[in-house]
Amino acid sequence: MMSATSITAPTPRPSASASPGLTALPVDLSHSPVLGIIGVILGAGIVTLAGRLLSLGLADLKGSVGFGADDGAWIPSAFNVALMFIGPFSVYLGGLLGIRKVLFYSAAAFTLISALLSLVHNYALMVGLLAAAGLTSGTFYPLTLTFALKNIPLRYLALVVSLYATCIEGAVNFAPSIYGFCRNNLSWQWIFWIPALLTPVMMACIYFGIPETPKPQTKKQPPSFMGFVFLSAGFALLYAALDQGQRLDWWRSGTFTALFASGMFLLLCSLVRRLRSPNFLVDLPYLRQWNTILLAVALFAYRFVLLATIIIIPQSLSVHGLDAQQYGPSVLWTAIFELFLAFVGALLLSKGFDARLLMATGFAAVAFACLINANFTSAWAPENYFRSELLMGVGQSFAIMGLVASLVQQAAFSGGLSAPQRALTFAAFFHTVRLFGGQVGVAFMGHFIADREKLHSNLLGLHVQAGSWVTDENLRQLAAGLSAKSSGLMAATGRAAEIIASKLRLQAYSLTFIDGFHLVAWACAGILLLTTLLRKAPMNFAQISLLQQEFISTKRKQS
């Protein structure tokens, strides 16, 4: 096993026979790597797209099926909580049944469930099927990337990393335009049918592009799954608490308190179970490494940075009454540009560019884009974001490509690929950080926007007081203009007061979104400092590819 702290820098042409890390290199290679790559990136993008389309189409789904506001709030939560549950549990499933088998059965079930969801009109059945869809699709994230690291030739690894990262990010920004087109030209049911159509393509690519791996070897006694159940259920309940916290008013709600307390109790149970009966499919000590911890923090920060395009920009336009198709172009530019940048990032990595520097460049670009967006006013339209969104696209693409590339290097050179339990533990850990950390960021940003809007409304309201000559003059002028289409002077004055209140609220939101952009910029500045603490990988992607080729040549000569 190789540790990140004990490997010395390699020579430009590393020797295959001298390197002790050769045993971690994948040797069961795909004979159709292009199909394997497509299958991996589809697995990442399908889940992201499905969750985003569900959130965007929630209002239409509730209106068409007849669900109330409170019931509808739990619909996307059912899908996302199930994703959170299956993340840690995928370690058990992948280690016990085999990665390829779990992926195929999960993909088949997800396809069937997605096709049936549009036909469901019963609330309990809808929530149950969405939970099942989350459970089945939640295996795509950790297992597809683990599968790729074990089977894709390393000369394609830079491209796989770039496309995998870009597909996750691009699906988020493509979703508003896709949903807007489907709703206006087709029907809202396509939020379920699109994932159902894409998943069989992923299954075919994995079947023909990646060879079957042998069933993982286990000890004589079967592994226990209770620890996984406790851990997964604990994180899932905490996820649900954070997801509903703002709507339920946090600790003032008994539901939130019960979810949070139950989640913490189950996490404590999983810890006790781990101490009393460790599971050989989980290698927690392997995660106690400097770069692993820092990269987990970086992944959490990146998920928070994404909220600039997931929450702040859409909400800054939706307060004007714009729907998904109308504000979609403001983030669509980012998604289109990222597809081109994926190949640029792959070229840079394949030429030996430092993944840490690529990640730092990306976060710096996002920070500058947020500072440009901090000039936001209530008069902005989607076109005003086009300039900054190009820079945002560069930043988000390079940041996620550098981050995923650093994760791959850390897994390879810390012994993560030398044992199945380490690879699965590594993938499940970062999958959990990505989902749970992302929800922590969403909950914080939602609470931040709500509180800052109240603050700015109160501060602006201090200057709009009854009896002030400025306020009274504005009321009189507006009432005079509205009197012709009002039933009387009192009605016209009431409508004028509503217009002033709406303008006040719009300005309060404008100041809130400016604060949000500044917050994201400061988060980028913090992650830039963190990247300076990351230790350099022993080899870059160009040297890794050369190492594998020499290793395979040596094996062939020996045979």
Regions found by a protein language model. Give the residues of each.
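Hydrophobic transmembrane architecture of multi-pass small-molecule transporters
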Residues: 410-417, 429-559
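Interfacial helix-cap and linker-helix signal at transmembrane-aqueous boundaries
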Residues: 61-62, 93-94, 126, 178-186, ...
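12-transmembrane solute porter fold
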Residues: 33-50, 54-56, 69-70, 75-76, ...
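Hydrophobic transmembrane-helix bundles of small-molecule transporters
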Residues: 180-298
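Cytosolic juxtamembrane N-terminal segment immediately preceding the first transmembrane helix
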Residues: 1-49, 63
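Extracellular/periplasmic helix-loop-helix junction of adjacent transmembrane segments
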Residues: 57-85, 125
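Central cavity-lining transmembrane alpha-helices of secondary-active solute carriers
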Residues: 77-92, 141-145, 332-345
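Helix-loop-helix hairpins in multi-pass membrane proteins, especially solute transporters
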Residues: 87-227
